[in-house]
Amino acid sequence: MLLCPVCHEPLVDDERGAACAGGHRFDRAREGYLYLLRSSKSGDAMGEPKSQARSRRDFLNRGYYAPLRDAMVELVREQVSGRATSTGSPMTLLDICCGEGYYTSAMGAVPGVDAYGFDLGKEMVRLAAKRGDATFFVANMKDIPVADGAFDMVTELFAPFNEREFSRVLAPEGSLFTVVPGARHLFGLKEVLYDTPYLNDEKLPQTTELELVGTQRVSANITLQTQADIEAVFQMTPYYYRTRPADKERLANLDTLQTDIDFIIAEYRHR
């Protein structure tokens, strides 16, 4: 299933971690994850800072995005019940850019699923491994260290879309589920930040190797209960980095915030 990131030979588990026939060894961290990057420095230097990773974990643990989590879990259940193998072996799932594992562990807890998740940030994967219900590893989505066609289900939520790698790791009859923000996602946040708030462009990935077979909208209205929650969700958005300091101050003065959450789940399969 997993490949050596150096020579791309299969990795074999042992007591300490995993190794390939080429002699490359990867130790398992205390939390249980594998570090599958070529450079030992990349995982610390890339990804979100520790404080931001923990803030995101705490935000998600409060259940604000539970509607999306539950929708993803239900899709996985449907896949398992509708395409169960005659051998009785579990269906494999890969969560790309899994972050701190909130969605991965929920999907991995579905009976009949063997889940894997990876992220570029070591702190994210460390937190994810503590959740359990999946095999976690640090890796780069530009060169995913897994075998061709190894996964019956591939999921990616809000990550850049790498069609070459996503289609490579997806099994011939598998399904890829990608999640993008809906038009009104966090519109209440934008109403505070901007004088003229705008709707998101619901742009689904355009593909050549994969075919869009269906979409599903998940939406709800939530009330963020603390300033920490408001700041955490703001940091999870791309406009956190391009909003003027004066506009950020508007959020800093709020203790609660009501807003829509809005997601589009799109399913792709091989053409």
Located regions from the model:
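Conserved Class I S-adenosyl-L-methionine
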Residues: 190-212, 218-271
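A short SAM/SAH-binding and catalytic strip from SAM-dependent methyltransferases
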Residues: 151-165, 180-182
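A short acidic, Gly/Pro-enriched loop at the edge of an enzyme's catalytic core
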Residues: 142-153
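Class I SAM-dependent methyltransferase SAM/SAH-binding core
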Residues: 92-143
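Class I SAM-dependent methyltransferase Rossmann-like catalytic core
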Residues: 47-71, 75
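N-terminal auxiliary segments of SAM/dcSAM-dependent transferases
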Residues: 1-46
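Conserved beta-strand signature within the Rossmann-like core of class I S-adenosyl-L-methionine
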Residues: 173-183
